[in-house]
């Protein structure tokens, strides 16, 4: 896909959805002795999401895992949708689009792993992070330059 085609797709976007682990984090999960886990988020992602909201777009997370840290980070960033523990991400995706009152063409989805491919393919703009699985990068409309 050419840059201009990606830009045309991006111009229609009203909602940005993303996986969390490997997209908003480096993909590592620190399992704590006392139970639970710990994740590290980058401030640049937070600023980008804040700017996205200022431009009038909404955002959200669809994740197969469940984490209190993800919930806190998403709410702290003002994300409209947080779907965790999604064994069937496509169902959560469809529910989110209905709730947001947007079409597939008006959604961008950022992913990094194989279970993100169906959502990327259903989206108007499917984005893979730079260090995504090769199969994910191959199917993306756009691949980021950096993680």
Language-model-detected regions and their locations in the chain:
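A positional/architectural concept
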Residues: 24-54, 63
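Generic enzyme active-site microenvironment
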Residues: 17-19, 110-111
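Substrate-recognition element of Asp-dependent hydrolases with the DxDx(T/V) motif
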Residues: 49-73, 84
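Short coil/turn segments at beta-strand junctions that form active-site/ligand-binding loops
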Residues: 12-14, 57, 105-106
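Non-catalytic pre-domain segments flanking phosphatase-related domains
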Residues: 1-18
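Mg2+-dependent phosphoryl-transfer enzymes with acidic/Ser/Thr/Gly-rich catalytic loops
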Residues: 35-39, 69, 76-77, 81-83, ...
């Amino acid at each position: 896909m050419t840059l201009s085609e990606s830009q045309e797709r991006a111009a229609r976007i009203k909602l940005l959805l993303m996986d969390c682990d490997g997209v908003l984090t480096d993909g590592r999960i620190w399992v704590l002795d006392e139970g639970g886990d710990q994740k590290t988020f980058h401030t640049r992602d937070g600023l980008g999401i804040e700017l996205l909201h200022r431009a009038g777009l909404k955002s959200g997370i669809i994740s197969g895992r469940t984490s209190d840290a993800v919930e806190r980070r998403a709410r702290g960033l003002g994300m409209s949708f947080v779907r965790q523990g999604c064994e069937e991400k496509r169902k959560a995706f469809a529910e989110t689009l209905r709730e947001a009152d947007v079409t597939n063409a008006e959604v961008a989805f950022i992913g990094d792993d194989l279970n993100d491919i169906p959502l990327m393919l259903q989206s108007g703009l499917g984005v893979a992070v730079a260090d995504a699985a090769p199969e994910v990068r191959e199917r993306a409309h756009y691949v980021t330059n950096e993680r």
